[in-house]
């Protein structure tokens, strides 16, 4: 299972945190708020998210960027 954290990143602070379990919905949210938000993708192990995200997604100059951790 995967969990997607939709958030506003301000420096090292996370604000406006929302949780989604569907990739398509997370990407729709990101498209809507692409100037200010990012999506962090986590694996879920034994009912809880892993310590670190697997991927992060954000827009830079209207181009979707995917970062692998």
Predicted features along the sequence, with ranges:
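A generic structural motif
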Residues: 6-9, 47
């Amino acid at each position: 299972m995967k969990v997607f954290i939709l958030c506003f990143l301000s420096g090292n602070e996370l604000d406006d945190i929302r949780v989604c379990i569907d990739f398509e919905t997370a990407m729709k949210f990101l498209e809507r708020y692409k100037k200010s938000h990012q999506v962090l993708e986590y694996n879920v192990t034994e009912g809880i998210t892993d310590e670190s995200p697997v991927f992060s997604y954000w827009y830079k100059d209207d181009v979707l960027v995917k970062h692998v951790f």
